[in-house]
């Protein structure tokens, strides 16, 4: 039922692909609200948001978020200003959904391949961030993980932090207990979106990575 709604929203906004990007972005926010509605109605799940006061204002920043389910890819669009996503290039080939991702300015990369496209990847990120007031969002774990998994963050996260020279907004979400990577969805549990204090620019690789990883994993331990 959830994915049927996503398809319907995509079809409704299909004509908007020929309109300004701002119109298409409304469809993304609707998908976020739709996911909240479905979780509440079918799984009796409430969405709790903590740390709204920590959201960086009047300055450029990028979001580094834990990744346990598809929930965050939809719902974070309702909290932040339509974030720019970094995603696998293959996703752009999906009919309608891939067109939507391309239209809203998502940045794609070919995983585990050295190519001319990948060599310009960080330039694309920098140019995109500097030309818009929408924050970039990345998932430093690299892929969806199970709630109790705590892999080291990918090194590319620091490279982005280093290249952009802007603050990082850490976000921890315990969505995997309700909408897991594997298995059935669980009912009567809450999902907490915890917006953590910003990490300022200018830190060393070791200091930044340690601060980011500790802040997100420590918060997830508290949420669990």
Question: Where are each of the predicted segments found?
Answer:
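Membrane-interfacial terminal anchoring regions of lipid-handling membrane enzymes
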Residues: 1-21, 26-29, 53-56, 128, ...
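Short gly/ser/thr-rich secondary-structure transition/capping motifs
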Residues: 42-50, 118-120, 174-176
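Structured helix-beta-strand junction loops
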Residues: 45, 58, 103-104, 131-132, ...
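Short acidic-hydrophobic, aromatic-tinged amphipathic segments that line or gate anion-handling sites
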Residues: 49, 107-110, 201
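Non-catalytic C-terminal accessory region of glycerolipid acyltransferases
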Residues: 119-224
């Amino acid at each position: 039922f959830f994915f049927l709604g996503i398809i319907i929203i995509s079809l409704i906004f299909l004509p908007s692909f020929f309109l300004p990007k701002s119109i298409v972005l409304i469809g993304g926010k609707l998908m976020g609200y739709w996911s909240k509605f479905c979780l509440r109605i079918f799984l009796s799940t409430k969405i709790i948001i903590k740390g709204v006061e920590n959201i960086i204002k009047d300055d450029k920043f990028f979001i580094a978020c834990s990744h346990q389910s598809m929930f965050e890819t939809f719902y974070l669009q309702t909290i932040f200003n339509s974030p720019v996503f970094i995603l696998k290039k293959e996703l752009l080939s999906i009919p309608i959904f891939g067109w939507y991702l391309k239209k809203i300015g998502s940045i794609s990369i070919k995983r585990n391949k050295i190519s001319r496209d990948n060599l310009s990847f960080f330039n694309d990120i920098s140019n995109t961030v500097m030309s818009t007031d929408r924050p970039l969002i990345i998932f430093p774990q690299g892929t969806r993980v199970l709630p109790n998994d705590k892999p080291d963050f990918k090194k590319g996260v620091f490279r982005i932090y280093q290249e952009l020279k802007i603050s990082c907004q850490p976000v921890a979400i315990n969505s995997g207990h309700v909408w897991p990577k594997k298995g059935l969805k669980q009912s009567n549990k809450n999902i907490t979106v915890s917006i953590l204090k910003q990490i300022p620019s200018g830190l060393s690789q070791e200091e930044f990575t340690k601060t980011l990883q500790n802040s997100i994993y420590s918060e997830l331990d508290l949420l669990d």
